[in-house]
């Protein structure tokens, strides 16, 4: 994960055409996933994939809203996916180790295997979920911490604003998210929680120290360091 909003993204456009009822047809081209033609009506879907700075994570954009603006859902293991039919379905793929939902994308992290062989299974799962009109989450939404709180000190409010306006939009482009967890006024340490492609990314330490920490120290003199929790 690099904290450079202008960094080039590797984008592959994947056209996925679904014809219901029959199994997938192997075209011999890993970037195209087709289903056999049947008499039932077809549903066309275009799923875009983007590489992330974390080689173990790939970003899938279904061309429609996923969580919606400002909302995220992180599933670091299959045990945490109980309320999401899509997350549960993705974890049924043996190589999948983590799933993350952003505003309009899905990040999938693998434990092993080659993306060339893993992508068709993920694409088929995502496509089936949306074409069947299944809910993304079941039950009441979890309560989330308010971004801003009237009781926040001026320093905390300033830190939160910088994270919301400068950090989160940048890391979302890389398929992840960073959440403010706290500020220790006595030590000046800001605690952040990494999600999605950011978690376990080889470059996350560099991003925290060279990108986020330097920015926060520049704008908020009270900040001395940033650490992941």
Regions found by a protein language model. Give the residues of each.
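Domain-level signature for proteins that mediate thiol-based redox and metal-cofactor handling
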Residues: 2-229
